From Swiss-Prot:
It is an enzyme of class 3 (hydrolase). This is Holliday junction branch migration complex subunit RuvB. It comes from Nitrobacter hamburgensis (strain DSM 10229 / NCIMB 13809 / X14). The RuvA-RuvB-RuvC complex processes Holliday junction (HJ) DNA during genetic recombination and DNA repair, while the RuvA-RuvB complex plays an important role in the rescue of blocked DNA replication forks via replication fork reversal (RFR). RuvA specifically binds to HJ cruciform DNA, conferring on it an open structure. The RuvB hexamer acts as an ATP-dependent pump, pulling dsDNA into and through the RuvAB complex. RuvB forms 2 homohexamers on either side of HJ DNA bound by 1 or 2 RuvA tetramers; 4 subunits per hexamer contact DNA at a time. Its main location: cytoplasm. GO terms for cellular component: cytoplasm; Holliday junction resolvase complex. The gene is ruvB.
């Protein structure tokens, strides 16, 4: 069941508090996202030279890629204050007003999950971002009056995993959109090696590579796996983490060589054995796995699609040859029309 915490989930878990010590503090320490990093450095340097607030920044990308870390680094590089909140926490316009009126000149306000702001809060945010003013309605009925409050010039840094849910007026007010992509194994190796140094644990190159290969392109997962592998190394009184120790630890955690866990393999195996590799509708899979549809679509499937194990077709979910090879199963012969664009809607 997906309510059991998964070792390889990119979402933040309660036990991830330990990863704060692994976060880079400066852009120079940040590994990966080379183009985004280079552009941010230029924008930050320019704003600092002009002694102006940085234009509003929007970070877009899957969970665990460093959106929050980059927001903190932006404030640190600018030498200004940093306030953090999230879309669901700002329930009403007054909550947003309280945050904005307490900002100093050029401060950074970070709103995670900004796509989850309510329409009423968004309406208040528009003039704040554009004109650095708050337009509030005080009172009700005939006694209601409009109040305009001047704000310090600030930088709003928004983060979202679902850019498509942002309204156009909100999206258009961000002068610096930054898309974050999954990390390469080489980049994750550097992140794991740096994390090992921070945690004061020995790490061989092949040990770092083994953890990086199973981290699903996501630094948050790499840090989580590193902390758990360190536990296995400590229990075995090992002087450092090598490939053998990492392989044993990750095997015990049921994270295989491709970064798939027990839930991923159960999903793929169900389609392979029960439905001949597909196509099979998502509602059928939800019933077969006793999982809600949104958990399958948002939690299980994205990585499988990204790695080429799964296709979403109009007729349903379909396993690829790559998936059968990974499972060690023989791929059945299938009608080529199953891969077509027509022939029925997916459930």
């Amino acid at each position: 069941m997906t309510d059991v915490p998964r070792m390889v989930t990119p979402e933040r878990r309660s036990d991830d508090v330990g990863d704060t010590v692994l976060r880079p503090q400066r852009l120079a320490e940040f590994v990966g996202q080379a183009q985004a990093r280079a552009n941010l450095q230029i924008f930050i340097d320019a704003a600092r030279k002009r002694k102006e607030a940085l234009d509003h920044v929007l970070f877009v990308g899957p969970p665990g890629l460093g959106k929050t870390t980059l927001a903190q680094i932006v404030a640190r590089e600018l030498g200004v204050g940093f306030r953090a909140t999230s879309g669901p926490v700002i329930a009403k316009a007054g909550d947003l007003a309280a945050l904005l009126t307490n900002l100093e000149e050029r401060d950074v306000l970070f709103i995670d999950e900004i796509h989850r702001l309510s329409p009423a809060v968004e309406e208040v945010l528009y003039p704040a971002m554009e004109d650095f003013q708050l337009d509030l309605i005080i009172g009700e009925g005939p006694a209601a009056r409009s109040v305009k409050i001047e704000l310090s010039k600030f930088t709003l840094v928004g983060a979202t995993t679902r850019a498509g849910l942002l309204t156009n007026p909100l999206r258009d007010r961000f002068g610096i959109p930054v898309r974050l992509n999954f990390y390469t194994v080489d980049e994750l190796e550097k992140i794991v090696s740096r994390g090992a140094r921070v945690l004061d644990v020995g790490m061989t190159a092949d040990g770092a590579n083994e953890i990086a290969r199973r981290a699903r392109g996501t630094p948050r997962i790499a840090g989580r796996l590193l902390r758990r592998v360190r536990d296995f190394a400590s229990a075995a009184d090992a002087a450092s983490i090598n490939r053998k120790i990492a392989d044993h630890a990750l095997g015990a955690l049921e994270v295989d060589a491709a970064g798939l866990d027990a839930m991923d393999r159960r999903y793929l195996t169900t389609i392979a054995l029960n439905y001949g590799g597909g196509p099979v509708g998502v509602e059928t899979m939800a019933a077969a796995l006793s999982e809600p549809r949104d958990a399958i679509e948002d939690i299980i499937e994205p990585f499988l699609i990204q790695c080429g194990y799964l296709q979403r077709t109009p007729r349903g979910r379909l396993l690829t040859s790559h998936a059968f090879r990974h499972l060690g199963l023989t791929e059945p012969s299938r009608d080529p029309s199953q891969f077509g664009l027509f022939g029925g809607e997916d459930e």
